Each structure stands twice: as C-alpha cells, then as structure tokens.
Design a protein with these regions (language model features):
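Canonical Radical SAM [4Fe-4S] cluster-binding loop centered on the CxxxCxxC motif
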Residues: 122-159
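Conserved alpha-helical substructure of the radical SAM core
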Residues: 147-177
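Conserved AdoMet/S-adenosylmethionine-binding subsite of the radical SAM
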Residues: 168-177, 182-237
Length: 237
C-alpha cells in the first residue's frame, strides 16, 4: 500500500520484541496527525470521511488508549487500524505526591523503553501540567541534570500531548494550563513542538487556549525568531 510522502509505507509483519522498533517505524502515528491528515489517511484505508472525525474525537477528546475502546467503529475497521496505525499511549510508571502542596510528579515510559517526567501543579485558577519535549537534552546547561547523558531523541507530538491526556485521566479533572519546561529544549524539537501546539489548541480536541501555554527555552535565538514569525499567542519564557 503506497501512502503519500509524509505517511510511512505500511508493511504487515509479526510482532515480537526483536522487531518491535521496525514495526513501529512502519505503522502510522495517528495521534500526531491533525484532522486533515487523519481524514486523508482514513479515506486511503477505504473508510468514509466521517469516520476520521469519530476517531479524532476518541483520541483527542475521550483520550482512549487503544483502538478497541472506539465503540462506534466496526470491529472490521478496528482491525484495519491495528494493521496500519499505532495509537501512542504512555505508561504511567510512578507518581510522587508532595505532602506540602499536592504537586504530582509523574514518570512515564515510552514504547522504546525510554522514560520521561511530567509534573501536575494544582492552583485555584486550574490545573497546570509541565511536560517534557525530549528524551535527554544536548544544550549542556550546567545547572540541569537533563543534559548529563546528552540527547537521546525528540518526543513525537503524540508523546508530548499524551502526557497531558494521561495526567488528566489520572486526576479526573480538566487541564487548563500547559508549560513546556520539563526534560529537553522545546525549540530543539521545533517541528514537533508546532504540531503539538496545533493539537493542543484545536477546538475539535482538548482545546486549550494558546494564551494558557508557556514554552521555556534556554535561548535558541534563530528558533525564537522563527517562533515569533508564527504569530502565536503563547508565552515564551
């Protein structure tokens, strides 16, 4: 099956630990897709256009962790999705809760075995989540432990936004503010950061205002200028 260039060619093969990474490179990460891309992908898989909206809602409004939870999608097409796509879902490994103010620190594992951290901070005005944007970091800031082992890789948009989804489900409350200030330099993962912002602020999804998003940087000036040209209403810190 040939997919347009910003999709991966789909190849079916048996799943096992040895070829897990190969398989995941062959499957399409649909949680990182915007609505237009998902619609085109679903049509290419032989389904009607309206299915894309249903699936997008399951992913970005109801925050399901598996295709099997999509109860208004036929079992036949669920299998097609499993054969051709992956639904990124972070695994919650540990939660530490501060006795002082109730701040919750999360340790999540990724599909490739790497781990990242996120933090939930509860305020009177709402719930704020601090997310990671990379596994490791190459900026070399002496005060930051994230850079000790260097950069492993940037997070996919799906891995960035699923930190918010998983924390929201864990506490059973809406997340109102997001800070990209965890592990990694967000502007060093620029394209994925922009897609994350698009998904985060989409009115068809979780719909968090750009004004409630803060991106922290150590000061990558060319990227800061590029971000300014995007004319977003986010806060750069």
């Amino acid at each position: 099956m040939t997919i347009r260039k910003n999709y991966r060619t789909i190849i079916k093969c048996e799943f096992n630990k040895e070829n897990m990474e190969q398989i995941k490179e062959q499957l399409t990460d649909i949680k990182s897709m915007n609505m237009d891309e998902l619609t085109e992908f679903i049509i290419l898989l032989g389904e009607k256009k309206f299915r894309a909206k249903q699936i997008y809602e399951w992913i970005h409004v109801k925050h399901v962790d598996s295709f099997d939870e999509m109860t208004n999608i036929s079992k036949k097409f669920i299998q097609v999705l499993k054969d051709n796509a992956m639904l990124i879902s972070l695994k919650k490994e540990q939660v530490q809760v501060s006795k002082l103010d109730g701040t919750r620190k999360y340790l999540f594992s990724l599909d490739d075995g790497n781990v990242i951290e996120s933090v939930l901070m509860k305020y009177k005005h709402g719930n704020s989540v601090c997310i990671s944007s990379q596994v490791g970091c190459r900026m070399g800031c002496r005060f930051c432990a994230s850079t000790l082992d260097g950069l492993v890789r940037g997070l996919r948009p799906s891995e960035m936004i699923d930190q918010i989804y998983q924390i929201g489900k864990d506490i059973g409350e809406r997340i109102s503010n997001v800070v990209v200030m965890g592990t990694g330099e967000p502007l060093d993962n620029y394209d994925n950061l922009l897609r994350f912002i698009e998904l985060l602020t989409d009115e068809n999804g979780i719909n968090i205002s750009q004004r409630n998003l803060t991106v922290s940087t150590c000061g990558l000036v060319p990227r800061m200028r590029q971000l300014a040209d995007e004319k977003l209403s986010i806060t750069l810190a």
